[in-house]
């Protein structure tokens, strides 16, 4: 059979039969809709054997069986679905999909025809319907439905709207989509949801076929994509099994497996995390693998005419999904109810918010490190490690925690659509953060992304009760705002145990203002256009260790986030280190350049810089002369001196290897948080280990119900080396 796709178009809702709603030409409507899928399959099977392959004949027989099963077509038992715009779209697209059964590599053929027709018309006309693929029709119909004023905006279609609380162990009979994630619409009807989807289907949402053309027209200085193809079409080829090598092509954005004899999809499909389109319609699947939920970039997922009865909870990760083709399956009626009332967005949110708890196998281990920097023992927690320390080391050491806590104003449902709404709420997260920070009981606590109000009303009262004192410094813009608005600006804070330390000196750095006051300040174009408007800060405190009389300088910072401004981050670190060196000279009794290397110093925070960055090179080597991050940039004196500093610093995790990640998100997972220390004054004696890898592999990003931030905390135990600051004069009592 080689019928072209039906000449369909979206028809405004409101009465009429399924045939009329589909707008199918009468010659095609007769065999398609009036005789039903079973008879259609029988008619095709009656054709001469040479026209239909054996695999196709088997598939058509299967479709016929599915078509005769009312469980696979809920509108047969519930006629109201015929007038539901969401289900009408299912029927439209399922009918289009069925027309391609038996056409080998149908997507490739349609794409070739589309390109041919565009070439013939010089791109002046839209391709004919016969050249449109199922994906093309899907996008077209979604846009038409979203723009159609005739689609009923009926509040009766919306669910009862009961509040979703922590759901584990409690079935939700009438689930609802969190209002915050549906733009607080009073009526969350299919038409409203489709209008929201229209924004995602705009011309700026480029699909991969368009990206190929876009790359061909890209400017010469655009980074070249070496991978020239991103699609595999194995449609209608009588495939029974898939080779595992297929899933090593992690660059794939489209995979077409429809019209085959597949009975399962392998778990390794999770490796295709660039996948945007997957069509597995007209197979013999009885389930979809939970691992498919890791393919969070999926926009269009089709599994028409299989035997799938439910959806994995892991599909709650598919926050980019715009269409889920499920007609022709004995899908659970509760899921169909949610789909038709809340659209695919509400269905995904339901799966996300009601997913069973994934237990954390064990807490992060604490790794004991010997004087040579080698790991020698692993403990279940830092408390257990402390209990095993000898008395001398316990007296000469202290512990420090660095943690980006994810400011509540950054943790929006729009930015973290993969996180259950209840787990993203600030009330829930702050309790988790409090429990986590207090559980570590470190001597020094350095936090980033803390709102002024949160510091004053949450962290300070809690930690003061635990015997801590603290200081805080908000980002620069807080100094230009009214008090009420300034309370919402985040910054950095440092807490220290009063039983372990006494504050000797405090200061803060606003990078831009500090540099403008520098005696060698120059108004370069890069500083004015790229760095001056960044309002990042650093917070500094000098502490006296009560048990040893030693002094340690503690600095915490949060650098600019944008990877396109890695030069600015390098500049910010250079300004910070330059300022710290001046403070060490003024308030540390530094006589020679070598003296400042012997002063205990810890610099920690979120540096938004990967291990191969200029920032890390600057910390490790003392300067950065030639690096892609700073290539062609001019920050005046800082660039002229290669951003150099005179401190001897090293990452605390350097001796045992950095963690697999400190920040986990769908689009970025890497190490960007560090604890740097002065190697001639301090020695690392313990480190907090990684999150259980098997547990982390089950999530596309953080936070979640167990980990309340998109970052994980770093924790280190430091030992003062003998006499590191015994000869250094310690004066000064400046405060902020």
Swiss-Prot record:
According to its UniProt entry, the protein's GO biological process terms are: DNA replication; DNA replication checkpoint signaling; nuclear-transcribed mRNA poly(A) tail shortening; positive regulation of transcription elongation by RNA polymerase II; transcription elongation by RNA polymerase II; traversing start control point of mitotic cell cycle
Q: Which cofactor does it need?
A: Mg(2+)
**Reactions that this protein is recorded to catalyse:** Exonucleolytic cleavage of poly(A) to 5'-AMP
Going by the record, the broad EC class of this enzyme is hydrolase
Return the EC number: 3.1.13.4
Give the compositionally biased regions (Polar residues).
Answer: 160-177
Alphabetical list of Pfam families matching this protein: Exo_endo_phos, LRR_8
Q: Where does Mg(2+) bind?
A: 449
Q: Which GO terms describe its molecular function?
A: 3'-5'-RNA exonuclease activity; metal ion binding; poly(A)-specific ribonuclease activity; RNA binding
Protein location: Cytoplasm; Nucleus
Give the domain of life. Answer: Eukaryota
What does UniProt give as GO cellular component?
A: CCR4-NOT core complex; Cdc73/Paf1 complex; P-body
Protein role: Acts as a catalytic component of the CCR4-NOT core complex, which in the nucleus seems to be a general transcription factor, and in the cytoplasm the major mRNA deadenylase involved in mRNA turnover. Ccr4 has 3'-5' RNase activity with a strong preference for polyadenylated substrates and also low exonuclease activity towards single-stranded DNA.
Q: Which family does it belong to?
A: Belongs to the CCR4/nocturin family.
- Protein name per UniProt: CCR4-Not complex 3'-5'-exoribonuclease subunit Ccr4
> In which organism is this protein found?
Eremothecium gossypii (strain ATCC 10895 / CBS 109.51 / FGSC 9923 / NRRL Y-1056) (Yeast)
Upper lineage: Eukaryota, Fungi, Dikarya, Ascomycota, Saccharomycotina
Gene name, Swiss-Prot/TrEMBL = CCR4
